[in-house]
Regions:
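RNase H-like, metal-dependent nuclease domains and their acidic two-metal-ion catalytic environment used
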Residues: 1-98, 138-223
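Short alpha-helix plus adjacent loop in nuclease-associated cores
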Residues: 96-145
Length: 223
C-alpha cells in the first residue's frame, strides 16, 4: 500500500450472504488518517460505508476497491475470514494487516496466511473499546479546557451513524454495533505501535574462571 503512512481502514465483515429478514448485521468499513507530514487532516475519519449488499462478494469487492483506491491497508477480524481470503485470492494479501499485539513468529499458521485480528480475546476487546474512548476524548466535541486541542476548538467527526453507534456501544454485546467495530479497528490500525509487545531482554551471565598463578601450581580463585 502506497499510503500506509497516511492512514488505514478498519472493517467489520460478514460471511453469509442470505439471512432471515431483519436478523443480519451490516458490513461496515471506516477509513481514517493518522498523524503524518502530508498536507491533509490528521486523525480524521474520511470514509464511512455501512451496508449489506445482495451478496457478500459484492461487499468484499467494494472494500477491496476502497483499499486500493486510497492505497491504505486494512485491519479486520479473522474469525470471519472470507473477506481476508478474498483479498488473498485477488493478490492483495499485503493490504491485510497482521494483528499488532503479537510478533510475526508468534502468529498462528492462519494468521500468517491471511492476516487479521481475533475478536474473541478479552485483551483485544478491551484495547478496541479503549481506542474508541480515547479517540472520542481527544478529537470529538468541544475541548473546553484545551487539553488536547486549542481551548474551545470543535472536533470534526462528520458521520452521524458512527457517532450514534458509539453512543450506544456495549462492550459485553458487540454484535450489533457494526460501525463501532470497524471504526475502532481503524483507530487500532493507526496506533499499531501502542500494541506491539515489548521485547524481553534477558541478562546473559558469563563467569570466567580466574586462577592464582603466584605459586608453582595454578589454583582457581573461589568467589
Amino acid at each position: 500500500p502506497g499510503n500506509e503512512h497516511i492512514g488505514s481502514f478498519g472493517c467489520d465483515s460478514y460471511d453469509i450472504s442470505g439471512v432471515v429478514v431483519g436478523k443480519g448485521s451490516n458490513g461496515s468499513l471506516h477509513g481514517m488518517t493518522k498523524f503524518s507530514m502530508e498536507d491533509m487532516p490528521s486523525n480524521h475519519f474520511f470514509l464511512e460505508y455501512i451496508a449489506r449488499p445482495q451478496t457478500a462478494e459484492i461487499f468484499f469487492e467494494e472494500v477491496l476497491m476502497a483499499c486500493v483506491f486510497y492505497g491504505m491497508p486494512i485491519l479486520c477480524e479473522n474469525n470471519k475470514p472470507r473477506l481476508l481470503y478474498h483479498f488473498k485470492n485477488r493478490g492483495y494479501r499485503q493490504f491485510c494487516l497482521n494483528r499488532p499485539d503479537k510478533r510475526y513468529n508468534k502468529l498462528s499458521k492462519t494468521e500468517r496466511e491471511i492476516g487479521g485480528i481475533p475478536n474473541t480475546s478479552e485483551d483485544v476487546k478491551q484495547s478496541h473499546a479503549s481506542a474508541i474512548e480515547s479517540y472520542i476524548e481527544k478529537y470529538v466535541g468541544v475541548d473546553f479546557l484545551g487539553t488536547y486541542r486549542t481551548a474551545g476548538d470543535m472536533g470534526d467527526m462528520y458521520f452521524q451513524r458512527t457517532l450514534e453507534d458509539w453512543a450506544k456501544f456495549d462492550i459485553s454485546n458487540r454484535t450489533k454495533f457494526d460501525a463501532s467495530i470497524s471504526s475502532g479497528l481503524a483507530i487500532m490500525a493507526n496506533q499499531k505501535h501502542l500494541y506491539t509487545p515489548t521485547k524481553e531482554k534477558t541478562k546473559i551471565s558469563i563467569n570466567f574462571a580466574r586462577y592464582n598463578n603466584s605459586e608453582k601450581v595454578s589454583r582457581i580463585i573461589n568467589k
